[in-house]
């Protein structure tokens, strides 16, 4: 390529999370994917790169065939280079190698079958890079991959001097790596067209190629972008300006690889894009990073110095959010089970279906949290959890996993043992270190984790909520990096945080007063809170059921034996409360269930209490003996019963999180609190019983 010319590798990455609402995909197609491809089709001279995740391609082929056929036509005439990747957009670095291969091969095979091409390059989900990837990707047939120029900056290179592609390796197996320009990521499509061309002109004669591939949703889905990009003509002007620039070659990545030598070798550290590194940090570290950036700016440090403030590591999300860690480790356990079962019975269709369900459960969106909602969005968590439960159910149906069965092991990497129980109807996790709490209550009859309630935690952006942050009045289209606005007033009142992780069979001893306990947050008033106490634990199989008994050694204020029995679709708990030998006691014993169905305030989601209140309501009843949480939409009833009769209270668990649309409240689940008055003579024992049964409607 002549020195006075510059190749510009422009492209888009289109993705919708597994489990996203159908109307969201329809809107994204109509507002971004289809109009972008239509304008591209009208200008045959424009050549660029497109990556669509496999699940989105499947949806387009079935639900928007015109858009799918348009993409196929563009690829067929060589105008678009399609990239492979993990079919369900997983974070490849954290998957077992056999799943890395399987995910890539599935998307590559789809493109071969339905488009007629074999992709050479790959899109790396969230650009999460780890140094072991070159060998695995190359062995999967990948010739080149894209990451951010941020990765290169962390290796000590100047982002403003980057161009072309670079060579890296692992164990001698090489891979080409293209740096994505952050400068162009922030300019396109938000700034005027000329700003991007001016920047490209500064790179002319210095590097052979510059690359900018970013989210296709920027071109019509993000707030304000549809009008800006299409109705006001930004994309037409951009394409016209690119074609009118004589020194600019519109190239695909394969064009550059075939025509240009590698720029240099490079070894990249663990990294993702800049924002991801910031989001992954624990809260205190996020605040320190913010101060460091401000201090550097005040001292006159430029972007080059700021590039070395690296932020965190993607895997830190697995520590930051224990619920995410549990999902990740469950995925790993199931991956091993699927692989072993397929090795024994490679032609069993049930196992093939289990493998596909496993891969769906590896979709990245519910495993982290940033400006796009992530793990705070229950429908995304539910989709991933449901896929993993489907995988587990199919393994059970094939006979690859026995039932009833239990194991006791450190199954989530936290150094403490959990008890994992499986029947033909349920799969659940009990935590001796959390007072015997249930943190997974998977109902295999509907592939639904009824216990999937995310705890309320402080996030760095909550300070903006308290300050009443609003979008400023500057003209122009805002990027996701601008301060978001609240979607409703009064969100600051919801900024309460949980001292203990959300779960079920959270229990404790309270005073004998008459002041009602808060069903959502009772624990600060507890005289004894079992979720804060590790308990002794024994487990055994008993006549087709699994019995797990937790004991507390201390006698004050009461000694506790908590016997949990799991049989088919029912979990029963029996409490034996004993007063100290020489001291009578009086108080209240309470047990909390945190349960997640599909919505808090939607038709067909309610409690069977008086008046059938919604799952998102708050209420209280005295002398109740049971209640059911009903979700007619998904077809599940969670039936609670207890004896003797007790006070029942309930309320919604709501978080405040941020998405590209602004700050918003999100219903995570319903907290149900059952409270018994208990008076014991010295040395007396009393037994209380409660149960939950999950049923199909």
Map each language-model feature to its residues:
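Active-site/ligand-binding surface loops and adjacent short beta/alpha elements
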Residues: 584-588, 594-652, 659, 669
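Acidic-aromatic substrate-binding/catalytic surfaces of carbohydrate-active enzymes
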Residues: 27-30, 98, 102, 424-536
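Active-site and substrate-binding clefts of carbohydrate-active enzymes
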Residues: 2-34, 41-43, 162-167, 171-175, ...
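Short, well-ordered beta-strand segments enriched in hydrophobic/aromatic residues
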Residues: 421, 425, 571-579, 683
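CE4/NodB-like, metal-dependent polysaccharide N-deacetylase domain
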Residues: 99-126, 201-214
């Amino acid at each position: 390529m002549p020195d006075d010319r510059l190749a510009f590798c422009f492209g888009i990455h289109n993705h919708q999370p597994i489990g996203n609402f159908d109307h969201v995909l329809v809107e994204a197609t109509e507002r971004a994917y289809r109009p972008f491809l239509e304008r591209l089709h009208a200008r045959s001279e424009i050549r660029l790169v497109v990556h669509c995740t496999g699940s989105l391609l499947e949806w387009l082929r079935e639900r928007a065939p015109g858009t799918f056929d348009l993409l196929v036509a563009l690829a067929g005439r060589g105008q678009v280079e399609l990239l492979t990747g993990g079919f369900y957009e997983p974070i490849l670095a954290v998957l077992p190698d056999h799943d890395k291969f399987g995910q890539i091969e599935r998307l590559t095979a789809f493109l071969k079958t339905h488009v007629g091409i074999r992709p050479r390059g790959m899109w790396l989900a969230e650009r999460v890079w780890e140094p072991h990837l070159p060998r695995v990707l190359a062995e999967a047939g990948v010739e080149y991959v894209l990451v951010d120029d941020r990765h290169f900056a962390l290796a000590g290179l100047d982002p403003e001097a980057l161009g072309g592609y670079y060579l890296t390796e692992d164990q001698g197996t090489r891979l080409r790596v293209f740096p994505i320009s952050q400068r162009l990521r922030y300019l396109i499509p938000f700034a005027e067209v000329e700003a991007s061309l001016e920047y490209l002109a500064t790179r002319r004669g210095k590097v052979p190629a510059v690359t900018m591939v970013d989210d296709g949703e920027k071109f019509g889905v993000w707030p304000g972008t549809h009008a800006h990009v299409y109705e006001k003509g930004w994309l037409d002007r951009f394409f016209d300006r690119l074609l009118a620039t004589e020194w600019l070659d519109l190239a695909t990545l394969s064009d550059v690889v075939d025509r240009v030598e590698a720029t240099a070798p490079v070894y990249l550290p663990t990294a993702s894009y800049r924002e991801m590194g910031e989001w992954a940090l624990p809260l205190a570290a996020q605040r320190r990073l913010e101060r460091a950036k401000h201090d550097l700016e005040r001292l006159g440090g430029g972007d080059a110095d700021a590039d070395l403030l690296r932020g965190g590591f993607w895997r830190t999300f697995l520590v930051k959010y224990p619920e995410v860690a549990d999902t990740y480790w469950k995925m790993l356990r199931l991956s091993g089970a699927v692989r072993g079962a397929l090795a024994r019975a490679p032609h069993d269709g049930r196992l093939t279906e289990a493998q596909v369900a496993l891969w769906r459960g590896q979709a990245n969106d519910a495993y982290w949290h940033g400006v796009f909602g992530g793990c705070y969005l229950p429908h995304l968590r539910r989709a991933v959890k449901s896929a993993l439960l489907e995988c587990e159910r199919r393994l059970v149906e094939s006979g690859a996993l026995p039932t009833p069965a239990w194991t006791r092991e450190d199954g989530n990497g936290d150094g403490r043992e959990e008890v994992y129980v499986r029947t033909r109807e349920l799969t659940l996790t009990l935590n001796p270190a959390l007072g015997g709490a249930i943190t997974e209550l998977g109902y295999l009859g509907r592939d639904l984790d009824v216990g999937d309630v995310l705890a309320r935690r402080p996030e760095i952006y909550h300070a903006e909520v308290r300050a009443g942050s609003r979008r400023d009045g500057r003209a122009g289209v805002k990027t996701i990096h601008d301060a978001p606005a609240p979607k409703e007033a009064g969100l600051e009142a919801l900024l309460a945080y949980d001292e203990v992780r959300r779960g079920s069979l959270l229990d404790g001893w309270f005073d004998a007063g008459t002041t009602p306990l808060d069903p959502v947050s009772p624990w600060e008033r507890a005289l004894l809170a079992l979720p804060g106490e590790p308990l002794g634990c024994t487990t055994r199989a008993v006549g087709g059921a699994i019995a797990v008994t937790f004991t507390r050694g201390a006698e004050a204020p009461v000694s506790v034996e908590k016997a949990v029995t799991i049989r088919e679709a029912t979990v029963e708990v029996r409490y034996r409360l004993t007063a100290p030998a020489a001291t009578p006691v009086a108080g209240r014993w309470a047990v909390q269930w945190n349960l997640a169905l599909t919505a808090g305030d939607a038709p067909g989601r309610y409690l069977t209490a008086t008046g059938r209140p919604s799952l998102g309501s708050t209420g209280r009843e005295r002398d109740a003996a049971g209640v059911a949480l009903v979700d007619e939409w998904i077809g599940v009833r969670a039936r609670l019963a207890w004896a003797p009769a007790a006070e029942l209270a309930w309320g919604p668990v709501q978080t405040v999180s941020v998405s590209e649309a602004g700050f918003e409240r999100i219903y995570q689940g319903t907290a149900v609190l059952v409270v018994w008055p208990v008076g014991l003579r010295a040395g007396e024992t009393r037994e209380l019983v409660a149960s939950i049964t999950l049923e199909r409607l």
